[in-house]
Amino acid sequence: MAPSSPRPALPALLVLLGALFPGPGNAQTSVSPSKVILPRGGSVLVTCSTSCDQPKLLGIETPLPKKELLLPGNNRKVYELSNVQEDSQPMCYSNCPDGQSTAKTFLTVYWTPERVELAPLPSWQPVGKNLTLRCQVEGGAPRANLTVVLLRGEKELKREPAVGEPAEVTTTVLVRRDHHGANFSCRTELDLRPQGLELFENTSAPYQLQTFVLPATPPQLVSPRVLEVDTQGTVVCSLDGLFPVSEAQVHLALGDQRLNPTVTYGNDSFSAKASVSVTAEDEGTQRLTCAVILGNQSQETLQTVTIYSFPAPNVILTKPEVSEGTEVTVKCEAHPRAKVTLNGVPAQPLGPRAQLLLKATPEDNGRSFSCSATLEVAGQLIHKNQTRELRVLYGPRLDERDCPGNWTWPENSQQTPMCQAWGNPLPELKCLKDGTFPLPIGESVTVTRDLEGTYLCRARSTQGEVTRKVTVNVLSPRYEIVIITVVAAAVIMGTAGLSTYLYNRQRKIKKYRLQQAQKGTPMKPNTQATPP
């Protein structure tokens, strides 16, 4: 080892001796600057001076890396102290002929915190609940000048000095609706303005708070209680009092079938509407679910829907088209658990089948046989109907009501001859006079003398034919005058006869009363006898 290696211990020894046994002389050691504040890892120039002109020894004692700057003279030295990581008190010392002395400079290191961190917030926070904010700060100096601030946006919630390592500051916030979407953060303030420097701030990463309100009441679910296979139903789920309603998630499902609702939002409510289709695979009792999820909470409503299969009843005719007089069997069959009624069947215990026997008549043509089936599903009565029509083939018919046998019309008047033939199939009708002259049935004609006569109306179809004679009488104007004269004479004679009768009757009554008065016989009042 080099002989000079133990020499650094000498100044330290001199410093110690000078401090313990200061010399009797007037020599003094001074240091400049006496106080310094500098950033961590920084450098500073320290000047050590002594009052004697020829000091035996002049230097600085410090664990810091140092570099002496050469200056003229023997009583002053300048040192560059570098990489200052923490507070330090370098000491200048001198040894003069008249004594030893020392002087200290105070180095204060400042640095901003290495970590400023706000504890993560819950993803959702219910309105009306307390939220605890927690900020941790590691490092930073000088601690006497370091403050921790909790913020909502730019609003201060709490301010405390940084104490401990790591320093921790907490506060509690009562969550409100208007806190939704607010940013919370933590900030440190290293205030060195009194030392002639500036205010150093460090801010944590912000966290955005999401608040919510989910009422304790379950959602309202409106749906059919029963649903038929291969049909569609509508499901509506709604809930009021939500915040923020746009963040609410709605899940609708029938059994394992997820529904796709259309959601309509109000100020603090929503309504979700969905169509549901069911098949034979869904038959039975299924669970309908409406779940509303908001934040980290949910509300759910369950209902049961009964899926059923109920085909319309089957109406069976022996033949849909029969001839008159044919025996016809009408059957009605439905679901095994259904109860059916068939019109025309007398009252009887209801079951899944009903039957009717009849002999086809013309009146049965076009007759509808209606079968009504009723099935009870989950306490509800479901009704289905089916109708079949019977066609009866029968021969033509011509009767007085629809084809009068005698028409009397004034000459030159407008008339429409009407004659309706009935039958199935509808027969062809022709009315001919003398086998050649047709009567224009259903057409408006001017009545002439040629129209007068007897016509043979023939109705013909595949089921046979029928004939009927009709007579057309045409009245000429001269016959009308005769008729009017006869009628007028009859009216006059009738009036004269009635007048003569009334006159003779009054005369006889007067004569009778006169005779009675002459005999002195009182006349009995013509009063009604009193009943016993």
UniProtKB/Swiss-Prot annotation:
Glycans are attached at residues 130, 145, 183, 202, 267, 296, 385, 406. Residues 41-103, 128-193, 230-297, 325-378, 412-464 form the Ig-like C2-type domain. Residues 504-532 are cytoplasmic. SUPFAM superfamilies: Immunoglobulin (SSF48726). One of its GO terms (molecular function) is integrin binding. A motif (Cell attachment site) lies at residues 152-154. Disulfide bonds join 48-92, 52-96, 135-186, 237-290, 332-371, 403-419, 431-457. The modification Phosphothreonine is found at residues 521, 530. InterPro entries: ICAM (IPR003988), ICAM1_3_5_D2 (IPR048679), ICAM_N (IPR013768), ICAM_VCAM (IPR047012), ICAM_VCAM_N (IPR003987), Ig-like_dom_sf (IPR036179), Ig-like_fold (IPR013783), Ig_sub (IPR003599). ICAM proteins are ligands for the leukocyte adhesion protein LFA-1 (integrin alpha-L/beta-2). During leukocyte trans-endothelial migration, ICAM1 engagement promotes the assembly of endothelial apical cups through ARHGEF26/SGEF and RHOG activation. Homodimer. Interacts with MUC1 and promotes cell aggregation in epithelial cells. Interacts with ARHGEF26/SGEF. Interacts (on T cell side) with CD81, CD247 and CD9 at immunological synapses between antigen-presenting cells and T cells. This is Intercellular adhesion molecule 1. The lineage of its organism: Eukaryota, Metazoa, Chordata, Craniata, Vertebrata.
